[in-house]
From Swiss-Prot:
Taxonomic placement: Eukaryota, Viridiplantae, Streptophyta, Charophyceae, Charales
Protein family according to the UniProt entry: Belongs to the reaction center PufL/M/PsbA/D family.
Species of origin: Chara vulgaris
Covalent S-S links between cysteines: none
Name under which the protein is recorded: Photosystem II protein D1
Site (Cleavage): A344, S345
Length: 353
């Protein structure tokens, strides 16, 4: 009898826990994805803050030349970063217990791998939590689909690119100047500016900014005034009101006359789908581009210069880009390589033969 009561009580306890986790009445929804998201993101955030402030220098290139990234070792907010895991570790899973000591783990950049892997798991669970909450509320699932774009981008630079290049040391440093350094080196080694998928990403980001500004300004300019001239127009809106808060016909008419009729949406639903889809698809393509360049399927190159009938080079913009890429590659890991990889490789065949 006692065992039966204990079993029933424990099952009730588990049931109450399940109800609490999946309840949409909580101030912040937890959900089953949140059960994994909360500890992983807390771990990533805590280790990032501690390492950004106090981590010792890391031997990023595996050549016994440690690079300092923390504030206590001479950096500021701009130059500081979590330095990626050493090339000596490569792609090995490197938790604290795999190192001989904590000092060795820090010297080899263990915190970077710890932060990145927990962060990626955490943001993936955040995306799942968005879907889960939408499901519980009877909403459509497109919020999680939209969030998949930044998740894909983060996964590309923190996981797919290191896998393709063979080492976590090639991942993006976790800092402001480290991000810019990653971008410059990426251009030098992969010519990303000449990759069509990056171009689509640029169109997505800048186009999304343009469309967001256009939409916001059109709505703000065509509000249906519910207040006097002495009050803010914003005060005329009541949360949850059934009436339209702006005149979409007026906005449609304005924009249709500003450009041409069919450049303007007359359907609010298709308009907002477009506003969401444009940047999301662009960032998807950029993440896909990073993932292909990770395995050295690079942007277009024009290594063969245009020459005249006498064999003299006719300089084009491609030649300037090539020279800039070589210059950036020479400066990258200057003590790890004697020559940039392009100059050390076999000479390109002549096209005059």
């Amino acid at each position: 009898m006692t065992a039966t009561l204990e079993r029933r009580e424990s099952s009730n306890l588990w049931g109450r826990f399940c109800d609490w986790v999946t309840s949409t009445e909580n101030r912040l929804y937890i959900g089953w994805f949140g059960v994994l998201m909360i500890p992983t993101l807390l771990t990533a955030t805590s280790v990032f803050i501690i390492a950004f402030i106090a981590a010792p220098p890391v031997d990023i290139d595996g050549i016994r030349e440690p690079v300092s990234g923390s504030l206590l070792y001479g950096n500021n907010i701009i130059s500081g970063a979590i330095v990626p895991t050493s090339a000596a570790i490569g792609l090995h899973f490197y938790p604290i217990w795999e190192a001989a000591s904590l000092d060795e783990w820090l010297y080899n950049g263990g915190p970077y791998e710890m932060i990145v892997l927990h962060f990626l798991l955490g943001v993936a669970c955040y995306m799942g939590r968005e879907w889960e909450l939408s499901f519980r509320l009877g909403m459509r699932p497109w919020i999680a689909v939209a969030y998949s774009a930044p998740v894909a981008a983060a996964t590309a630079v923190f996981l797919i690119y290191p896998i393709g290049q063979g080492s976590f040391s090639d991942g993006m440093p976790l800092g402001i100047s480290g991000t810019f350094n990653f971008m410059i080196v990426f251009q030098a080694e992969h010519n990303i500016l000449m990759h069509p998928f990056h171009m689509l990403g640029v169109a997505g980001v800048f186009g999304g900014s343009l469309f967001s500004a256009m939409h916001g300004s059109l709505v703000t300019s065509s509000l249906i005034r519910e207040t006097t001239e002495n009050e803010s127009a914003n005060a005329g809106y009541k949360f949850g009101q059934e009436e339209e808060t702006y005149n979409i016909v007026a906005a449609h008419g304005y924009f249709g006359r500003l450009i041409f009729q069919y450049a303007s949406f007359n359907n609010s639903r298709s308009l907002h789908f477009f506003l969401a889809a444009w940047p999301v698809v662009g960032i998807w393509f950029t993440a896909l581009g990073i993932s292909t360049m990770a395995f050295n399927l690079n942007g277009f190159n024009f290594n063969q210069s245009v020459v005249d009938s006498q064999g003299r080079v006719i300089n084009t913009w491609a030649d300037i880009i090539n020279r800039a890429n070589l210059g950036m590659e020479v400066m990258h890991e200057r003590n790890a390589h004697n020559f940039p990889l392009d100059l050390a490789s076999v000479e390109a065949p002549s096209i005059n033969a």
